[in-house]
Amino acid sequence: MKIKKSRIFAAQMQNNKIFSIGILTFVALIGSNNCTMAQETDVQKPRPTFGLEYTGEVQTDFKKLKSVNLLELGAQLPLTSKLSVELGSISVLTTDEDILTNCLQNFSSIDAPNIPFALTTAGLAWQINERHHLFAGIHRIDDNYFCSDMLGLFTHSSCGAFPTITANYDIAAYPVSALGIHYGYTKDAFSLETSLYNGVGYKDFSKRDNVFRICPESDGVFLMAQGEYDKNATRAYVGGSVLYSDLHATAQKQMRPVVWAYAEQDLTERFSVLAGYSHAFNNDITCHDFYLVCGRYAYKKAEFGVFSSYTRIDEKDEWATELTCNIQFNKIFSLQPALHFANTDGKNKCVGLVRLGVKI
């Protein structure tokens, strides 16, 4: 009986403490705009967020110049504390829609034809709980996959998505998107991503080239999944994809799988390395294998990187190497010069570029 009374008394004291703290916090908020209370209010009532990112490049093969300008807009509009609308778009302006060199892999990850406006994200995002999240709508695979810090340092297109996927299939990778569903799971050091998309990506709003188009019969379906392990100084990624399609009626409809794996290791506080491999099955495709190795060294506000890869596309071998340095001046501005070397079918090529980044 004494124990029960003492528990009741303790609970009353606890309630009195909570009540007193609540009164004091309320008075402090009214009198001095208490920051802690304001943060709690923000959590309870999420606010819309908007973003703008500009990436500009000047490219040269040391014979002529070319510029590419990419503008990305994004917005997240909360409906509830866990449900929100996500929107994103790109606009591309270039002085020359042709690639400077006829490399099998494009040396620039933002190179694209002129695009006045293309919708890249439009859908509902549901944060089910701290471990599970779901998105349904228009999206791109390179927004969720191949997004490691080291791959993000380089300007080469194969660091945005491996050519065993992008060189073989017209799936939803930059600059096109597709309707689909994406699910993510995270627990401790492990995370899992899986997606199901329309088998072909689009960027316009008219007739067949419609980003809202979903037609498994003619476009096929594209399934993708990746597991990630991130603990201490090691980050490992293993994934695979399957396209069920007839490749626009040019071949019999069948499963077309691709697998990949890559790992990052921090050797010191400043120096990291990465190695990866990807293989595409089936005989009626252009790219079967892709190998890559990278190194990164961080010093103050600068990151120095070297990237080298090998692939075989259309029965031609290509070795590609990039030397780059990304300087982050502040949270808004960055500058990144890069030098690309490629040996394609025995022919050597060299391209230089300077990339300016503005993020708000």
Per-segment meaning from a language model:
Residues 81-82, 192-195, 228-314:
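Detector for outer-membrane/organellar transmembrane beta-barrel domains
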